[in-house]
Amino acid sequence: MKFAIISAGEGSRLSQEGVALPKPLVQLNGVAMIDRLIQIFVRNGADKVVVIINNESPLTKEHLAKLQAEAEIPLEVVVKTTPSSMHSFYELSPYLQDDKFCLTTVDTIFREEEFSTFIETFKQSETDGYMAVTDFIDDEKPLYISTDSALDITGFHDAVSY
């Protein structure tokens, strides 16, 4: 299974709050967010990890180059500034063909045990895709979904849709 990380944002909110590091390198419990995700992906059977970063991220690019040299699995880095996460997904799409994949943003926070259950369930399914969602919103531009009674996603929205 392939895993991909969108890490091409500007991190403008963090810098406004006085955080000097780029978002992927901000530490949670002593581990950079990007490292945490890659480690979790490896523990969940990743065959390959692909990360997209923007052109204005020399520290992140340097950090990922070090990780590539030490990686247990292929780690691809795409360097391209994109206007949105959807555009970043498009840039990653050639790397994600011919297998199931998991796509996330670098600042996704979750319990590893829940994530592992989610990934294992997806691996065992015949479904085209799964999407993990939450009702907790702390984002400048959240993405909302609508579902039917079977919890199948019926739409993606920029605002709450009833």
Predicted regions and their residues:
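Conserved N-terminal catalytic core of the sugar/cofactor nucleotidyltransferase
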Residues: 2-5, 13, 31-103
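Glycosyltransferase donor-binding loop in the core domain
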Residues: 26, 84, 110
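Short catalytic helix/loop segments, enriched in acidic residues and glycine
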Residues: 20-35
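The conserved acidic donor/metal-binding loop of glycosyltransferases
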Residues: 105-109
